[in-house]
Amino acid sequence: MSGLTFQQEIRLLGAKLVVPWILLLVLPFAERTLLGSKTYYFLYIGLGLVFVLYGLTVRTIFSFLQHARREPVYVWIGYLAWSVIICSILSVFAIEYDLLPQTPEPSITHGRPLIDYFYYEIITFTTVGYGDIIPATAQGKLLAICTALLGATHGVTFVAIILQALTQHPPAKNQG
């Protein structure tokens, strides 16, 4: 990425990373449109692609950080944005496939408020797991397993990215 300005590098990195994650959102809606019903095939494909994209994203970030020194604030902001994107995508899968148990309160999401899906994904992703929402179907449990694995890996990956950035480009020492 030599010869590019920092803003150009960020735009290129964003295109490489964000666009595939956004395209992943098409899967749950495509299944209903193309097949006419929910067969869960695209759910399984989508969850597999989440792991593949996660690995590619980590590889791209490591490569990006190897070539230039970056301020830690950008790494932190990127980490938070990436966390929100992952949880949002997993929430879309949970909403579209209706993977959480029903509640007596009617809403546009087949019986659960939208915030419950996002709350469930965040709590599972951070491996807190309060236990107030428990998936009842095999597909819901599979989503919980994938979310917990990604969440546990995500924290370790963030530490590895920070350490890699610091070891490649240690902070300058004050000479006084």
Features from the language model and the residues they span:
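Pore domain of cation channels
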Residues: 112-171
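Membrane-helix interface/capping segments
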Residues: 56-77, 99
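Alpha-helical transmembrane segments of polytopic integral membrane proteins
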Residues: 54-62, 89-93, 97, 127, ...
